[in-house]
Amino acid sequence: MDLPLDNRLSLGIQTIHRRTEPGVGPWLPEIDELVKLVQLVDRCGYDSMWVGDHVAFALPILDPFLQLAQAAVVSRRLTFGTGVYLLPLRHPGPVAKQIATLDHLMEGRFIFGVGVGGEFPKEFEVCGVPLNERGARLTESLQVLRTLWTGQRATHHGRFFNFEGVTMQPPPRQAGGPPIWAGGRSDAAVKRVARLLDGWMSYVVTPDMFRQGLDKIADAAGAIGRKFERGFVASHLLFTRVDKTYEAALEAATKSLSTRYAMDFRRAAQRYCALGRPQEVVETIRRFYEAGARHVILDFVGPYEERFDEIERFAAEAIPLLQDLRTAHV
């Protein structure tokens, strides 16, 4: 089957309060900085803002729900989302309430991106969740969310969670709850997307790998006869650096991502990042679009203090080169 993809390309920005890059001096998140950042992203014409999630990470990171609630006060236009939230680490009951609340506070401009995690096993240890249960917990948690979001008297009996006759009010602003997108490229992950979710969020893949992932989702959805009544969005989180030369961009990306992930990221940066002059970066984005990506989330890499300049530079020098895709007929 063919997935019901729109034609228009949307662009998002990853990260609000997060210090994961080499920087100067101590990192103390500031409200004024968040306000300026969200205003800048809105003014530059991007479509969305996203934050990641870790309970215990190599470098400082704040809770995504609290960041988004703070950011949503600043813009009445932008869509906000988690990219991605490690749902297996939490009980889905309180999460259902938090998401319903966020959806109302954002007036229905929220997308819930989820993932299984696993790269940092200590997160699972501190949350008391066996690492080998993360996939099964995610699947069941998604079912619990949808059940509670009906706003009706709900019952669920599963492997991990059990309740009977629970009514959670109010339900989310968006009928049926906000769209849920999921990351992952394993066979289990793509089958989960095909069966239960409204979108796919890829990460650290090439355009060819992206296309293969979408094909697997389409085949799995076709095998069970799923119609995607709410539509389907194919998205990609893309590490990006616009610079004077490809080599300068590669050096900045390597240093930044090696710090973030505590490993040598040079070869991965060469393969998976969009780097170089504006034309080179745009060409990479176009290849992802041709592979089926319709929402590209830009994670600008480089020194933390440069992110305002990176957001402005991309908007001024790269977005105009993508206008044909951004105004494509839906």
Regions found by a protein language model. Give the residues of each.
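Hydrophobic faces of well-ordered beta-strands that scaffold small-molecule active sites
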Residues: 11-15, 49-51, 80-82, 110-114, ...
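Active-site mouth loops of central-metabolism enzymes
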Residues: 17-32, 85-92, 174-185, 240-241, ...
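N-terminal small/glycine-rich loop or linker at the start of catalytic domains
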Residues: 1-25, 118-122, 159-177, 246-272
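Flexible, glycine-rich active-site loops centered on histidine and acidic residues
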Residues: 6-29, 88-155, 203, 208-212
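Short, acidic/polar
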Residues: 28-41, 98, 182-192, 277-287
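N-terminal beta1-alpha1-beta2 module of alpha/beta enzyme domains
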Residues: 1-74, 178, 301
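Conserved, mostly hydrophobic/aromatic
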Residues: 41, 45, 53, 71, ...
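Alpha-helix-loop-beta-strand connector modules within alpha/beta enzyme cores
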Residues: 62-82, 137-144, 312-330
